[in-house]
């Protein structure tokens, strides 16, 4: 190969490697957790549009009959920059959750998640300073500032 061709090929390879290495960073600010059974899940993510904490619970179906049938909706609680509340969610998460054993705590993406012994998750959204509970019911314990 000629030196120019080799340099161009090396440059293209380096550029492709840089693009490939940068691709996972799009999800680097996404943190997904669940209780040990996997029936209560939370995803915390940051985008250019803002910060979101979203938690869903299969356990809360009795407390939230408006969020049925199971194949279409799930009880949820959501924290965003300008809104905190409960709703029925109809989408999945972007990645599989990390299962938390009871009494464990994880932090990431602007939230701290505590796995309670009964399977509920308590989430302190440290960006909004909101406290939510998701499990047997979905609740906003403190709406934040």
Whereabouts are the PLM-identified features?
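A low-complexity, Ser/Thr/Gly/Pro-enriched, surface-exposed linker/loop concept
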Residues: 54-100, 130-145
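Short, exposed beta-strand-loop hairpins at the edges of beta-sheets
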Residues: 119-134
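Bacterial N-terminal signal peptides
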Residues: 10-20
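Bacterial N-terminal signal peptides that target proteins for export
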Residues: 1-11
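C-terminal region of N-terminal signal peptides and the immediate post-cleavage residues
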Residues: 19-34, 39
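Short, surface-exposed binding/anchoring microloops in extracellular/periplasmic proteins
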Residues: 35-67
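Glycine-centered tight beta-turn/hairpin loop motif at sheet-sheet or coil-to-beta transitions
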Residues: 37-39, 108, 127
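Acidic, glycine-rich flexible loop segments
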Residues: 91-122
